[in-house]
Amino acid sequence: MAALRALLPRACNSLLSPVRCPEFRRFASGANFQYIITEKKGKNSSVGLIQLNRPKALNALCNGLIEELNQALETFEEDPAVGAIVLTGGEKAFAAGADIKEMQNRTFQDCYSGKFLSHWDHITRIKKPVIAAVNGYALGGGCELAMMCDIIYAGEKAQFGQPEILLGTIPGAGGTQRLTRAVGKSLAMEMVLTGDRISAQDAKQAGLVSKIFPVETLVEEAIQCAEKIANNSKIIVAMAKESVNAAFEMTLTEGNKLEKKLFYSTFATDDRREGMSAFVEKRKANFKDH
């Protein structure tokens, strides 16, 4: 959750001082952003691509960036042509954490009454699948942001960590909860209590990421996966995502009940009828998203 460039290896030679985000401003739909880059990708422009773009600050997650990210997510969520979203950063860093200067003078009262970081998890309320394409550092808030996504693809040199303990605090945007669910108690506890990072290879072995790709092809691979998802029925994809996510919130019995209800619900859709008819007739399904 915290900005962690000061915690990167001494081999980096110099420690970059945290860069303060200017006061954020709201953007009208379609306007240019200051901290992110957005575009549509894929043959049918069915993939929304969001790139964090504060390279000098290693994509430190300031308030303005999060506000822009949430707006971009909502824009793609409401776009009927977009079926999935890819979130990425740069080759050096996905995101090295939150902006320290933005939080170092906060008090308990500020955090509690202002619900500090409460808008960070907006991405978890997006119904369309979000794939994190992680190159370089995903530390603190950067790691938490990646874990809020539905799928994580990692570049070969990616590193994941929750080093907040080294700053005298703990993760505050879901790090202790999502990391533990993803990799298990022992590894999560070790990472959170020591601040140690894990490599992309270790992250895959632990179940944090699903696939690893060369740095230069990572984003394209994520886009291809998103495009494959976007070819399916959007309403059915949303149901499937809801059901899988429920596995982390419910007991097995409760989860199975929800899955059954959602399964039954697919029979109220035209896309379920089209999908099964296409299978029987040995043709490609033509989903209409209803």
UniProtKB/Swiss-Prot annotation:
GO cellular component, one term: mitochondrial matrix
Effect of E164Q: Reduces activity 330000-fold
One Gene Ontology term of the molecular function aspect: 3-hydroxypropionyl-CoA dehydratase activity
Residues at the site labelled Important for catalytic activity: E164
Reactions that this protein is recorded to catalyse: a (3S)-3-hydroxyacyl-CoA = a (2E)-enoyl-CoA + H2O; a (3E)-enoyl-CoA = a 4-saturated (2E)-enoyl-CoA; (3E)-hexenoyl-CoA = (2E)-hexenoyl-CoA; (3S)-3-hydroxybutanoyl-CoA = (2E)-butenoyl-CoA + H2O
Enzyme Commission number, as recorded: 4.2.1.17, 5.3.3.8
Chief location: mitochondrion
Residues that, per the record, bind substrate: A98, D99, I100, K101, G141
Effect of mutating E164D: Reduces activity 1250-fold
Boundaries of the annotated transit peptide in chain numbering: 1-29
Modified residues (N6-succinyllysine): K101, K115, K204
Stored InterPro entries: ClpP/crotonase-like_dom_sf (IPR029045), Enoyl-CoA_hyd/isom_CS (IPR018376), Enoyl-CoA_hydra/iso (IPR001753), Enoyl-CoA_hydra_C (IPR014748)
Record's keyword terms, sorted: Acetylation, Fatty acid metabolism, Isomerase, Lipid metabolism, Lyase, Mitochondrion, Transit peptide
Modification N6-acetyllysine occurs at: K101, K115, K211
Function: Converts unsaturated trans-2-enoyl-CoA species ((2E)-enoyl-CoA) to the corresponding 3(S)-3-hydroxyacyl-CoA species through addition of a water molecule to the double bond. Catalyzes the hydration of medium- and short-chained fatty enoyl-CoA thioesters from 4 carbons long (C4) up to C16. Has high substrate specificity for crotonyl-CoA ((2E)-butenoyl-CoA) and moderate specificity for acryloyl-CoA, 3-methylcrotonyl-CoA (3-methyl-(2E)-butenoyl-CoA) and methacrylyl-CoA ((2E)-2-methylpropenoyl-CoA). Can bind tiglyl-CoA (2-methylcrotonoyl-CoA), but hydrates only a small amount of this substrate.
Assembly with partners or alone: Homohexamer; dimer of trimers.
Family (UniProt): Belongs to the enoyl-CoA hydratase/isomerase family.
Name assigned to this protein: Enoyl-CoA hydratase, mitochondrial
